[in-house]
UniProtKB/Swiss-Prot annotation:
MF (Gene Ontology): carbonyl reductase (NADPH) activity; erythrulose reductase activity; L-xylulose reductase (NADPH) activity
Protein name: D-erythrulose reductase
Binding residues annotated for NADP(+), in chain numbering: 13-41, 155
Keywords from the named record: Carbohydrate metabolism, Cytoplasm, NADP, Oxidoreductase, Xylose metabolism
Family: Belongs to the short-chain dehydrogenases/reductases (SDR) family.
A single GO BP: glucose metabolic process
PANTHER family in the record: D-ERYTHRULOSE REDUCTASE, D-ERYTHRULOSE REDUCTASE-RELATED
Organism: Gallus gallus (Chicken)
Residues annotated for substrate binding in this entry: S138
Pfam families per record: adh_short_C2 (PF13561)
Summary of subunit composition and partner proteins: Homotetramer.
Length: 246
């Protein structure tokens, strides 16, 4: 994908950048002129990303480690753009939900977003920089899905966190929005939804009749990061083919 938006000279941090949506966002921002720091807990993914796009600065870090995150993200900044993409999906029936699933999911999907955003926003404010933050949420924040009790809950919490962030950071010229995709055809998405019966049941609920491609989500993120959306904050951009209206 060749983005037609310019981020020349702007500093960007992308979490969960080793694979899928986060990786594609990091590459797209780099091609659009941004100075990108790509964060992942998997060193091999970062190594292959840097080979693909040598201008990217890798940052290997587990966001569940609060103190390490404070030190590493603080030292890597300041940033003007932030994409909180890192997430886990530990799917279990409600009656079998484990403490481990709850703690890990909220650590990564909610607590890490709050913490990274605090670090980055404080630096933006200290530097007098306007900025944009995009939190990658999900249609699951607004629609119950079987076996998704914890995941749906973390994404719902993320949506409300984003709205409060938008309210409190707006006076500092920092915009905060979410993108809320349906199933996305990342490598993992293609594997998880390869069963025709399972995928057909979901696609039948999507008016456009298809799952999202990675570029569909990347384009939405780039728009929300860009000055093209200068008056947009506190919003959730649905990238769901109409799933939520069906």
């Amino acid at each position: 994908m060749e983005p037609d938006l310019s981020f020349r000279g702007r500093r960007a941090l992308v979490t969960g950048a080793g694979k899928g949506i986060g990786r594609a966002v990091a590459v797209a921002l780099c091609k659009a002129g941004a100075r990108v720091t790509a964060l992942s807990r998997t060193a091999a993914d970062l190594e292959s990303l840097v080979r693909e796009c040598p201008g990217i600065e890798p940052l290997c870090l587990d966001l569940a480690d609060w103190d390490a995150t404070e030190a590493a993200v603080g030292a890597a900044g300041p940033f003007e753009l932030l994409v909180n993409n890192a997430a886990v999906a530990m799917l279990q029936p409600f009656l079998q939900v484990t403490r481990e699933a709850v703690e890990r999911s909220f650590d990564v999907n909610f607590r890490a977003v709050l913490h990274v955003s605090q670090i980055v926003a404080r630096q933006m404010i200290a530097q007098g920089l306007p900025g944009a933050i995009v939190n990658v949420s999900s249609q699951a924040s607004q629609r119950a899905l079987r076996d998704h009790a914890v995941y749906c809950s973390t994404k719902s919490a993320l949506d409300m966190l984003s709205k409060v962030m938008a309210m409190e950071l707006g006076p500092h010229k920092i915009r905060v929005n979410t993108v809320n995709p349906t199933v996305v055809m990342t490598d993992m998405g293609r594997i998880n939804w390869s069963d025709p019966q399972k995928s057909a049941a979901m696609i039948n609920r999507i008016p456009l009749g298809k799952f999202a491609e990675v570029d569909d989500v990347v384009n939405s993120i780039l728009f929300l990061l860009s000055d093209k959306s200068a008056m947009t904050t506190g919003s959730s951009l649905m990238v769901d083919g109409g799933f939520l209206v069906s």
